[in-house]
């Protein structure tokens, strides 16, 4: 039964990823005054499936000098971790209801760094290695601010359990009292998922394609699936944290519909940003985090910690 539960979670995610690739190409197309994919199926709707068949039926080439085991394990690990991170998300009922769901998600996103590092190192190519090192430095750096912002939100939530966020936000979205945190969180999720304008890992002009330059066919498709599954997951996490949805136990499908609409809008903004902004320079990327975001998030975190202590002596304002 548990296997069926897992499959009912994984298959819709993979389907959503397939159509996200199509939506991205369509949006980029319309923003550049062209149509995008429109040949395969009605309005190009079957394009993702054609791409999948093409990629998975090609021969997976491997450089002769690469480290075989790591080279094969890295893409599988990337996708496995990307799909594992969905398990504690309440939609409205999570696959695994954890008390420390937030910590689990932080740990999983930290582990995702290893798949990138292994793929870059195992490829035995200087471009792949530089791309992987950039990705690791960027991901680890932005995880610092993500963790501090999460801590601030959880201080308002009063629990590490994600399902209680719906109760916390019954009256007011956390976006309003903590909008600076929400804005920094959104920009940090862009950097965490290696999306434009922070896609320095795959700077075509300098690194060919980044850490996955030596990958082809199936393994390359696995990296691609992992990246897009992470994008949707991060946006759903943002919607749960800052745009809390009211959960009525008698009508749980309303919660799901509401959450999916919010996630879709956030994902669209990811694609819109990709079409609108050029890539950052690497030193600007690091400057933004260590000199701007980190002091601000630390100050706001201290404020959220001291607020309940300062107001502890005030009688209840009802």
Swiss-Prot record:
Bilayer topology annotation: Multi-pass membrane protein
GO molecular function: NADH dehydrogenase (ubiquinone) activity
Gene Ontology terms: cellular component: mitochondrial inner membrane
Keyword GTP-binding set for record: no
Annotated organism of origin: Balaenoptera musculus (Blue whale)
The keyword Membrane belongs to this UniProt entry's keyword annotation: yes
Protein task: Core subunit of the mitochondrial membrane respiratory chain NADH dehydrogenase (Complex I) which catalyzes electron transfer from NADH through the respiratory chain, using ubiquinone as an electron acceptor. Essential for the catalytic activity and assembly of complex I.
Keyword tags: Electron transport, Membrane, Mitochondrion, Mitochondrion inner membrane, NAD, Respiratory chain, Translocase, Transmembrane, Transmembrane helix, Transport, Ubiquinone
Protein name: NADH-ubiquinone oxidoreductase chain 1
Subcellular location: Mitochondrion inner membrane
A Pfam family matched in the record: NADHdh
Taxonomic classification: Eukaryota, Metazoa, Chordata, Craniata, Vertebrata
Its EC number(s): 7.1.1.2
UniProt-listed InterPro entries: NADH_UbQ_OxRdtase_su1/FPO, NADH_UbQ_OxRdtase_su1_CS
Chief location of this protein within or outside the cell: mitochondrion
EC class (word): translocase
């Amino acid at each position: 039964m548990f296997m069926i539960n897992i499959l009912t979670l994984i298959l819709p995610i993979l389907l959503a990823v397939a159509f996200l690739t199509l939506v991205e190409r369509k949006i980029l197309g319309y923003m550049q005054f062209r149509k995008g994919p429109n040949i395969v199926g009605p309005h190009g709707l079957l394009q993702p499936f054609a791409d999948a068949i093409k990629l998975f039926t090609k021969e997976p080439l491997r450089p002769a000098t690469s480290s075989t085991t790591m080279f094969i394990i890295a893409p599988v690990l990337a996708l496995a971790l990307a799909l594992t991170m969905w398990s504690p998300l309440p939609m409205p009922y999570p696959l695994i209801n954890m008390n420390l769901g937030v910590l689990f998600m932080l740990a999983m996103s930290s582990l995702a760094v290893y798949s990138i590092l292994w793929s870059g190192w195992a490829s035995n190519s200087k471009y792949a290695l530089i791309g992987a090192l950039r990705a690791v430095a960027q991901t680890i750096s932005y995880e610092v601010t993500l963790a501090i912002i999460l801590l601030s939100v959880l201080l308002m939530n009063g629990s590490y359990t994600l399902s209680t966020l719906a109760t916390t936000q019954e009256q007011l979205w956390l976006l309003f009292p903590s909008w600076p945190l929400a804005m920094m969180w959104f920009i940090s999720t862009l950097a965490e998922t290696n999306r434009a304008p922070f896609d320095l890992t795959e700077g075509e002009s300098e690194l060919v394609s980044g850490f996955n330059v030596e990958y082809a066919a199936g393994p390359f498709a696995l990296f691609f699936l992992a990246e897009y599954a992470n994008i949707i997951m991060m946006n759903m996490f943002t919607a749960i944290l800052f745009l809390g949805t009211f959960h009525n136990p008698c009508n749980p499908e309303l919660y799901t519909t509401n959450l999916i609409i919010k996630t879709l809008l956030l994902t669209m903004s990811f694609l819109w940003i990709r079409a609108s902004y050029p890539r950052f320079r690497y030193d600007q990327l690091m400057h933004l985090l260590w000199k701007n975001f980190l002091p601000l998030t630390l100050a706001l975190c201290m404020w959220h910690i001291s607020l309940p202590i300062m107001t502890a002596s005030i009688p209840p304002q009802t």
